[in-house]
A protein has these predicted regions:
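Acidic glycine-/aspartate-rich tracts in secreted/extracellular proteins
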Residues: 30, 66-68, 80, 107-108, ...
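Alpha-helical segments with a strong preference for the paired helices of cellulosomal dockerin domains
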Residues: 72-77, 552-573, 581-601
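Conserved beta-strand positions that form and line the central face of beta-propeller blades
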Residues: 101, 551, 578
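Bacterial N-terminal signal peptides that target proteins for export
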Residues: 1-7
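N-terminal signal peptide c-region/cleavage motif recognized by signal peptidases
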Residues: 14-17
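Feature for long, exposed domains in two main contexts
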Residues: 319-546
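Divalent cation-coordinating acidic motifs and surrounding scaffolds
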Residues: 20-321
Length: 601
């Protein structure tokens, strides 16, 4: 039945993640006596769980009560995006099931040579795995999973204690300061049990209960309980309601010391446990596990009671900060800061998913001084102004030494040799040999001479290798009939930009045409970039190409407009309109105008 049901659930999991942030889930699979579809949906819900502020794909699944014959089935439920770690079954399947671990292979690489089986009594074994953390040189997490002997009574308690002793003895063989997560169905009934005390008492190999060593019995501690999510037995799933804390994730002190790899405060929880179902089924009435989304909580609770008779445990862990830096200000403008960027490159979903990066920065060589920065994960890079004199142009060099004081970031300081140049600002000018910011360009053309083109040069005055290029950002469109046809280049160094203009002399009467053209410019896109405006005035005279006496308006043609001018002066004595020179503007002048009708020749 289990394999047949899997046909509908194999596609639930994505194959990869884009984060280094760690989420660990431990879950007693109840020897797969539950519903396969429900199990797959519960595991997906573990990745989607944002009840404590954020969701992140599960990095590591640890299962108890796993039958070797169903490993392929379990792999399908977990999803193809996870790799199965070393699996061993020393007849554990006959004694309550073996242990299995699946991990995201984009985050970890298993060191299989470090796998161990540890006898824990009652025919069962704990497994120890070692995962090297990708992206962190030399960083490793050890994980233990176990299923200790169940039931009350001093004999069963002693069996559990002996199993814990064997596990703690193994922990003591690991390097000092190792990161260790110990999970499983421990079957501890109280913190007074010898096995629990053996795990948590001070000394070598101690592991810590994230919820503290206080009592977990009774309704006031329901949030801590993990068994059983169902009230009445359902096939192979044991009932009884939610009133026991059998499942644990114990941690080494290195995972709860506030730095580097570390448990994120407040994220240790039983998936779907809203604290309101003491000694009852987790789906009795409403489930408020997801704040403000009761329907979602109810849907999860319905899956939990048919998936297993335990609740999954989830804990989120921060990763160490990652020191990153960049330097792009090898060329800056006079008066600007030359900035060195320091980054926290930890790839996480939320800022608390990685440690804060604390860095001490020392300057030497041609530089001097020191400073320090603190950069939370997902923050913008911190700009550190280098102690460079940028008041004058010139070259510089120096050494920057970065030493992180954040745990587990680096083992040696990072030493960076730098050099750069301070350059002068660009200087727009309409002349090569002088700084000319305001300029009037005069030119004349004969009327009726067609389209006439003309050019104006714009220089970067004084340009050499120690000066910024001149970026021409905008040339104001001139008033018609003057037309701007564009620039030969928008970036001016030693070669000037050619601004191309034209005017159609056939379409306009003789006149003086003037246009004012503010030109916006700036430095290169460098630190200290400045903007400016130069003013160009273009003045074009269109003059008559030919003239005749009767062409009063000077447009090169005798026509109606000239008659109207003559009539307006009828009877007057203006010599310009007295074509026959008899001292009065009259009929004889009109006849002479008509005789000259048409273009002047």
């Amino acid at each position: 039945m289990f394999n047949r049901l899997l046909i509908t659930v194999c596609a639930l999991y994505a194959s990869g993640v884009a984060t280094a942030q760690i989420r660990v889930v431990s879950y007693n699979s109840a020897q797969f006596n539950g519903d396969a579809n429900a199990m797959a949906e519960v595991l997906q819900a573990a990745s989607d769980d944002d009840s404590h502020g954020f969701a992140v794909p599960v990095s590591i699944f640890l299962f108890q009560e796993v039958d070797e014959a169903l490993l392929a089935t379990l792999q399908n439920v977990v999803g193809s995006g996870y790799s199965m770690a070393t699996f061993t079954d020393q007849n554990d399947s006959s004694w309550g099931g073996a242990q299995a671990m699946f991990y995201n292979s984009t985050q970890f690489v298993e060191n299989s040579a470090l796998h161990e089986d540890i006898f824990t009594g009652a025919g069962r074994h704990a497994d120890r795995w070692a995962l090297n953390v990708s992206g962190y040189s030399g960083k490793r997490i050890y994980l233990y999973s176990m299923h200790l002997k169940s039931s009350t009574g001093s004999s069963n308690q002693e069996t559990r204690r002996q199993g814990v002793e064997n596990v703690r003895d193994d922990i003591m063989t690991l390097p000092t300061g190792s990161h260790i997560i110990v999970v499983g169905d421990m079957n501890f009934y109280s913190p007074n049990e010898p096995g629990y005390i053996w795990f948590t008492e001070a000394g070598d190999g101690q592991v810590i209960d994230p919820l503290g060593n206080g009592d977990w019995g009774g309704g006031s501690n329901t949030l801590k309980h993990t068994q059983s999510p169902l009230l009445n037995q359902d096939g192979g799933l044991i009932g009884g309601g939610l009133d026991d804390r059998f499942d644990f994730q114990f941690l080494s002190s290195s995972l709860i010391d506030g730095g580097g790899f570390d448990l994120i405060s407040g994220t240790y929880r039983a998936l779907g446990n809203d604290g309101n179902h003491y000694n009852d089924a987790i789906n009795a009435g409403n489930n408020y596990y997801f704040p403000g989304d009761t329907a979602r909580g109810n849907a999860l609770a319905d899956k939990l009671i048919i998936s297993s008779d335990h609740m999954p445990l989830i804990a989120d862990y921060q990763v160490p900060a990652i020191l990153g830096w960049s330097f792009e200000d090898d060329r800056v403008l006079v008066g600007a800061d030359a900035n060195f960027l320091v980054r926290n490159d930890a790839q996480v979903v939320v800022s608390q998913g990685a440690d804060v990066l604390d860095v001490d920065i020392d300057f030497s060589g041609g530089l001097s001084g020191s400073t320090s920065v603190s950069i939370p994960a997902m923050s913008a890079p911190e700009e550190v102004a280098l102690p460079v004199d940028t008041s004058i142009s010139g070259s510089w060099d120096g050494v920057v030494t970065l030493t992180s004081t954040s745990p587990e970031v680096q083992t040696v300081p990072e030493i960076v040799k730098l050099s750069g140049d301070v350059i002068e600002h660009a200087n727009a000018s309409f002349a090569f040999d002088e700084d000319l910011d305001w300029y009037t360009y005069d030119i004349s053309f004969d009327g009726n001479s067609g389209v006439q083109s003309f050019n104006v040069w714009l220089f970067n005055y004084g340009f050499d290798g120690s000066q910024s290029l001149l970026e021409i950002d905008d040339v104001t469109t001139p008033d018609l009939p003057i037309v701007f046809n564009g620039l030969s280049t928008n970036s001016v160094g030693s070669i000037p930009a050619l601004m191309e203009f034209e005017i159609d002399t056939d379409s306009v009467p003789p006149d003086t045409y003037t246009s004012f053209l503010p030109i916006s410019f700036s430095d290169e896109d460098l630190a200290g970039e400045q903007n400016g405006i130069s003013m160009l005035t273009v003045r074009v005279d269109v003059i008559p190409s030919t003239s005749c006496d009767a062409d009063f308006d000077g447009d090169g043609e005798v026509d109606v407009a000239d008659i109207l001018i003559l009539i307006a002066d009828w009877g007057g004595s203006d010599p310009a309109h007295d074509l026959d020179g008899n001292g009065i503007v009259g009929v004889s002048d009109l006849l002479l105008l008509i005789a000259a009708w048409g273009p002047c020749t």
